[in-house]
Amino acid sequence: MRRNILTALACSWLTAHAASVDLKSLLLESDIQWASDTVISFSDTPEFEDATVRWNSYNAPTYAGAISPADEEDVVKVVKLAKEHNVPFLATGGRHGCTDMVGLQEGLAIDLSQINSYEVDSDDATVTVGAGSTFGQFQNAIHDAGFMIQSGSVTCPGFIGITLGGGIGRYTGIFGLEIDALISARIVTADGEVLTISETENAELFWGVRGAGFNFGIVTSATYKLHKLADNNNGEILTADFIIPANKTLFYFDWLESLGETMPPNAAGVSRFQFDSIAKEGQIGANWVFIGPEDEGREFLSPILDLQPSVAMLSYVPWNKLIETAGGGQGAMLCEARAPRSLFTGQMRKYTALTLQETFDKITTLWETHPGLAYTSLNFEAFPNHAAVAVPDDATAYPWRDAIGWFQFEIISLEGVGSDSFNAGEHAGQVLRDSWVRTSGYDNHTIYVNYARGDETLEQKYGASKLPRLAALKKKYDPDNVFGWNNALPTEYPGSG
């Protein structure tokens, strides 16, 4: 607790100090030779909006100015400038984060979206992407070159940003986490130094970046290994969308529990607990994928089909078209920015039907008693971990390779933040999060850091066994905590030396 308080006090001091700095004059100083395409913007301009708009507007940071660097050299310049003048800043790619960042007020936004290059090397079976590249920008190029890569569930987040926290997704069972595909990266540290990191170069920092990377610098580019389509069913995927009504959810959850550790590595599911505005009741919108022959996929999904869901739509698509197809194309909806979302999240290493049903029932009661929460929903991701756990636990900083399920309870109130319905949703979120722990398979609440709300302990996000090494890295590469707004690490921890 004392470590968290000290970090908060340091961040508060930086925010207060920023108010006394004339950021506009600082950024527009004539002696600074920014690249011609670098954009500097301030409030009430379209450029500023483009550089700062966030997927989640709840408890969001605020900025006095923004810079959109055109290249790595300008990233170095702005980091040095901000550190020299004690200006708090946050570097972002797709700005699709879950974590509350209300502590950062009137800071500097470093928008990396212009550094969005990508290059596929077919001979080496790699792709190199820039800091602001999103999966949606380069997935087709990878496919057309004859490859595929593990990714998250939507196309709009910055690909590198997802990687820095671990990178779970539908392909975790066959390819592992995104960090398991990472070969090397270039990172700008707090001193403005550019380092190449890999298993053979700055290897200890490379270890820490794979699971807590946003604590050590700004990654300007990264190279990943690709997987041949020819080795993976030519990249063809069976995708199946189902609508499961309230009276059949327990049967569906029983099937999920029966999978347990037997779920095949080439299958994955996302189940959305949502309100049916026509039937005026809860339902589950589920998408399941099977990376393999269509007949095998249909056999795997036969227990769901036997439930006779109210909707069942199956199609066979190339992997690069999955996100735009799955869930009736809900990927685009999940990328809509600006909504005030309060999120409560959790993870598990086993599926329990009773917990899933109790969660569904509690949210149903919430919909019934608070009509303003009709757009409130819960996503439950079921991703097998075969390839993830095949990597030794101590190979990377990521601590939760044994997890196979993730909850994301998303509170959106039509009546606005602070309304009775919003507050009821927040209370329900606390209750639900506590209830998930009991059957999660973990002794305490744990969370994939990219899904962290921000109120979790260090141990719940990073794992107690990883923290000594992580704290030592933080002390070495960012002792002043300039990269301290996104689930910050301490510079001291028992055993860190």
Swiss-Prot record:
Alphabetically, the GO molecular function entries are: FAD binding; oxidoreductase activity
Q: What InterPro entries does the entry give?
A: BBE, FAD-bd_PCMH, FAD-bd_PCMH-like_sf, FAD-bd_PCMH_sub2, FAD-linked_Oxidoreductase, Oxid_FAD_bind_N
Range of residues in the leader sequence: 1-18
Look up keyword 4Fe-4S and say if it applies.
Answer: no
Q: Give the EC number(s) listed in the UniProt record.
A: 1.-.-.-
* Limits of the FAD-binding PCMH-type domain: 59-229
Keywords in alphabetical order, please: FAD, Flavoprotein, Oxidoreductase, Signal
Per the record's keyword annotation, is Flavoprotein included, yes or no?
Answer: yes
Superkingdom: Eukaryota
Pathway(s) the chain acts in:
Secondary metabolite biosynthesis
As cofactor, the record names:
FAD
Q: What happens when the gene is disrupted?
A: Leads to the accumulation of the prenylated benzyl alcohols produced by fogH.
Family per record: Belongs to the oxygen-dependent FAD-linked oxidoreductase family.
Q: Which PANTHER family would you find in this protein's record?
A: BINDING OXIDOREDUCTASE, PUTATIVE (AFU_ORTHOLOGUE AFUA_1G17690)-RELATED, FAD-LINKED OXIDOREDUCTASE AFOF
The entry's function note states: The PKS fogA releases the carboxylic acid (8E,10E,12E)-3,5,7-trihydroxytetradeca-8,10,12-trienoic acid as its product, as well as derivatives with one and two double bonds.
Q: From the Swiss-Prot or TrEMBL record, give the protein name.
A: FAD-linked oxidoreductase fogF
Q: Organism, per UniProt?
A: Aspergillus ruber (strain CBS 135680)
